[in-house]
A protein has these predicted regions:
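Short, solvent-exposed loop/helix junctions and linker helices
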Residues: 7, 67, 108-111, 188-189, ...
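Short, charged helix-to-loop "capping" segments that act as catalytic/coupling loops
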Residues: 36-44, 73-85, 122-129, 227, ...
Length: 363
């Protein structure tokens, strides 16, 4: 019996991982206590997602456990022990605005929760592959000091910079060589750095198979977008439902690369076929799937057939927020040449618009 343990199993990446691994013959053990409702309010609860998981996946087994509870986690891991073939740890406090209000809660979940997961894996199923969803926020605000130029709809990297910096790839994107030190991370970023480094350590020191994926904007139709977190899904929600939206700083020209949850989980799968010990990968949509907020508004309007412009631009950017960030995917592609992006940004946005419209029709 091959078992996949997935934390944050009702979240965006977790639920996609449940589907993906279940389709490939794994028994799924899900761990999720819907902290999302506590972070962002009832409207962001993952209850519905959990219901649909249970109805879709026959032998899905759910544990309503807080990852800060070492004893309870250990009970689950002791029960299944070496049958556990892969652990996908996505559960987290995911918002940097929220983290600043409750730093202790944020750190206990992101850093200590991850530590607990690593340790129960080491003690019960040390040969399992361990996947950690880290974040590009581990690089702090270093990307904001790059040489950027302001264009009509977006900020862009000056092309001369490509050659000057060892951490900029050939297509003008950020690779894993960028330092995670000496920078302002946000409290959330710092707690994820602690977890990221500890995951590397369990790989390198204990020889465990650990993959660390530093996500750009992760998105897809299952995303319970909230204003503080998940910009694309929240923007789609506002446009389809004709609600106001606030852009925080940078004139709406801030750039992110977006990766669909399916393509990210497929990265985990490829890594799992030939795992490495404590390897880090930047995991985003890359340059081809990068977009600014202004460009996203245009694209969503086109796809949704709307003419929405109910947004205001606040001068106040979020502390430590990236002005421009695009992930260089070259390292992962070199290690795992079978992997590719299969769902581009336009397809992703189309799915999200359809998902929102269906919700609207059900009301």
């Amino acid at each position: 019996l091959k078992i996949a343990v997935i934390t944050g199993s009702a979240g965006l990446i977790g639920s996609q991982a449940c589907d993906f691994f279940s389709e490939r013959g794994y028994k799924i053990i899900g761990i999720d206590n819907d902290m999302r409702a506590y972070f962002f309010g009832e409207s962001s609860s993952t209850k519905d997602s959990l219901k649909s998981l249970k109805s879709k996946i026959n032998d899905y087994e759910h544990y309503n456990i807080d990852i800060r509870d070492y004893e309870k986690l250990n009970e689950v891991f002791t029960e299944y022990s070496s049958d556990i073939n892969i652990v996908i740890h996505t559960a987290a406090q995911p918002s940097h605005d929220w983290a600043a209000n409750e730093p202790l809660t944020d750190f206990s979940i992101n850093a200590m929760g991850t530590m607990n997961m690593l340790e129960v894996t080491r003690l019960n199923c040390p040969k399992a592959t361990f996947i950690f969803t880290s974040t590009n926020k581990v690089y702090g605000d270093t990307p904001n000091y790059l040489d950027l130029i302001e264009k009509n709809t977006r900020y862009e990297l000056k092309s001369e910079t490509y050659k000057l910096k060892h951490y900029i790839g050939n297509d003008g994107s950020i690779n894993e060589q960028m330092s995670i030190d000496n920078t302002k991370h946000s409290v959330f970023g710092a707690s994820k750095v602690a977890a990221d480094v500890m995951c590397q350590e369990y790989g390198k020191y204990f020889g465990m198979n650990v993959g660390i994926f530093r996500g750009g904007c992760l998105t897809g139709p299952n995303h319970a977008g909230a204003e503080l977190h998940g910009f694309l899904s929240y923007l789609v929600k506002c446009i389809v439902n004709d609600k106001p939206y606030t852009i925080f700083g940078y004139k709406g020209k801030q750039v992110r690369d977006n990766i669909h949850s399916w393509d990210l989980v497929n990265m985990f799968w490829e890594f799992h076929q030939n795992p490495k010990q404590g390897e880090v990968y930047n995991a985003g949509g890359g340059r081809d799937n990068s977009i600014s907020i202004l460009e996203a508004i245009d694209t969503i309007n086109k796809i949704a057939g709307t003419n929405w412009n109910n947004y205001t631009i606040s001068d106040q950017n979020r502390i430590g927020d990236h002005i421009w960030y695009i992930s260089d995917l070259k390292k992962f592609r070199t290690h795992y040449p079978n992997w590719n992006i299969t769902i581009d940004l336009e397809k992703t946005i189309t799915q999200m618009v359809e998902f929102e419209k269906n919700k609207l029709n059900k009301i």
